[in-house]
Amino acid sequence: MRECISVHVGQAGVQMGNTCWELYCLEHGIQPDGQMPSDKTIGGGDDSFTTFFCETGAGKHVPRAIFVDLEPTVIDEVRAGIYRQLFHPEQLITGKEDGANNYARGHYTIGKEIIDQVLDRIRKLADQCTGLQGFLCFHSFGGGTGSGFTSLLMERLSGDYGKKSKLEFSIYPAPQVSTAVVEPYNSILTTHTTLEHSDCAFMVDNEAIYDICRRNLDIERPTYTNLNRLISQIVSSITASLRFDGALNVDLTEFQTNLVPYPRIHFPLATYAPVISAEKAYHEQLSVAEITNSCFEPANQMVKCDPRHGKYMACCLLYRGDVVPKDVNAAIATIKTKRSIQFVDWCPTGFKVGINYQPPTVVAGGDLAKVQRIVCMLSNTTAIAEAWARLDHKFDLMYAKRAFVHWYVGEGMEEGEFSEAREDIAALEKDYEEVGLDSYEDEEEGEE
């Protein structure tokens, strides 16, 4: 089997983990204690869900996941929550003190005390796999643990499991909704460190998700649970093809092959449709064409940026539920006729399509309506450079005055790392700019 190990780091990662595993359990009919009444084969049957769950001799299903945080309170909620029997106690790893929103603490001082314990546990999980496919890492850019510890872990995983894919789901600091003043520092530092260790990173911007909750679900003041439920639907759509059999299945490595044209340009934009509340869904039947169209609306994106100002390099549509290829092809043909969607000229308008017949599941008592079909679009577009530009600008404002830098230096970092990281992200912006240029422009420049 092609197993995936999920690693949830820091508060954001752990809370995303909670909602994701809650949803996976519902989708596979696994109870909170790990029993699965529908599964008649005790012991490792050849089921698709074993990519994410391993089965014990007693017929219990245990997630192939690890939760790590440098302070215990968030993971204690898992230890006391309704899914406490689902996870192996050694898969929930906590430190004694906090990452304190400080990349240097997560990466150097506090992180290095706990990293070996985490890697041991990952090694045990990897040993249970017959054909480990790769790692999914969930974290935020802004927190100390999410930024610092994740980058340390990714470096070490590259060393231990060189050829395995590493995908990230990262919470990008929202332009308006900020949880820490030093988010820009942490984000730039972690991006710089993980850039060469990550194969593909799906960014999720809290503010974009807030807006979707407000606009589409009529939630006036969305809580983190509301946000995470929506994020978990997206993660579930991306991983559905690994967990269920479908007509057109997509493997982890297949994502990279189709979405990443150059190793550094590995930040696809995720869009999910339809996000609709139960009251409205009752009155609307959303066709394949409609949901496909709404994927190209900037309002449904997980990161605030405008693809109409950028160009698409690759596009991957993952459908789920009652969808047939004929409808999909018709929907794509309609989209290609629209001029607002521009592809780079060196990439013919290729859409990769995945179809999974498993209908979408929603959490009971949640905000999302149960619908017949959904689509999650992953597109690699040059517009995401806007997100880096915003972050760089904030970084520059603070770094010009060397504000807060002493906290990082005090934890054993060197100031040179800041400028090195900042230059790397500037280079990333430049890379995006160059990729978007038309190829004939490059040739003319070369001749002059």
Swiss-Prot record:
It is an enzyme of class 3 (hydrolase). A motif (MREC motif) lies at residues 1-4. It is found in: Cytoplasm, Cytoskeleton. Its main location: cytoplasm. Pfam families: Tubulin, Tubulin_C. Tubulin is the major constituent of microtubules, a cylinder consisting of laterally associated linear protofilaments composed of alpha- and beta-tubulin heterodimers. Microtubules grow by the addition of GTP-tubulin dimers to the microtubule end, where a stabilizing cap forms. Below the cap, tubulin dimers are in GDP-bound state, owing to GTPase activity of alpha-tubulin. Belongs to the tubulin family. The MREC motif may be critical for tubulin autoregulation. Dimer of alpha and beta chains. A typical microtubule is a hollow water-filled tube with an outer diameter of 25 nm and an inner diameter of 15 nM. Alpha-beta heterodimers associate head-to-tail to form protofilaments running lengthwise along the microtubule wall with the beta-tubulin subunit facing the microtubule plus end conferring a structural polarity. Microtubules usually have 13 protofilaments but different protofilament numbers can be found in some organisms and specialized cells. This is Tubulin alpha-5 chain. It comes from Gallus gallus (Chicken).
